[in-house]
Amino acid sequence: DDPESKSHGQLISEIYAHLNKQQRNEYFYMNTLLNKLLCGIHNVNTTSAFSQVRIGHSIADFVMINGEGRVYEIKSDLDNFDRLYDQLRYYFCAFSKVSVLVSIHELEKIHEVLASFGDMGDAVGIYVLSERGTIFNKERSREPSIYNEFLNHSSIFKMLRKREYENIIRAYFGVVPQVEPVFHFSAFLEKFEEIPIIEAQKLAFQEMKKRNKITVEQFQKIQPELKAVVYFSGLTSKMPALDQLLKIQYRG
């Protein structure tokens, strides 16, 4: 077909369909996961999702926070499991529930790999992206278990923005440390460490969840193939302009 007879939106849909058939990369996994979680199981009014969250020396592919926090590590067919142990260990420093999302071709392998990780591996959830694009198939999935062996205040605290940890300390203690700017971070971390770890984690998640500014109506209007791009880039305010661009005929 002549691409110049189609709109930008139509071409993006065709490229995405090609990815689905030929090369399901990390974006395809992430976008599918976001669509399934925020359009199906949860909704954007009660749930916030984040991508590329730094935890220790690793970066979590996908984090979801509603009443609890969950990490999803994406392993597409283009990835391997060489660094998985270290990645999971870092994630468990801040989160109690961690899962791995793999392709159907890697299902047997991921069970073997996680089994070699001992108790930590046993706690990790397993989800599978099927050929039909489903993820939460009960027969193939394994729900994550709570695992707090590595949970620590510092890892949780370092995910927070300045305003967020200030809100937590002010709400919990009624006062905030009065220190020179150079000591600000360490003084607030010291107070944060006085909060019981599970409570500290809960308060951190409550603050992080407030970052989500998109409504259900706005989210539903985003072209399915572009939901992750718009959601994680904070482009909500530019959606009218994006909608117009997607309707314009491609000119080469």
What are these regions (language model features)?
Residues E190-G252:
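C-terminal, charge/polar-rich interaction regions
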Residues L78-G118, V124-Y127:
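Catalytic cores of nucleic-acid endonucleases
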Residues K21-Q23, Y27-G67, L114:
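Active-site metal-binding core of divalent-cation-utilizing nuclease and nuclease-like domains
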Residues F62-L78:
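Conserved catalytic cores of phosphodiester-cleaving nucleases, focusing on short active-site segments
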Residues S48-S51, I74-N80:
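Short, flexible loop segments at the rims of nucleotide/cofactor-binding pockets, characterized by
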Residues R132-N212:
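A conserved mid-domain beta-alpha-beta active-site/ligand-binding segment of alpha/beta enzyme cores
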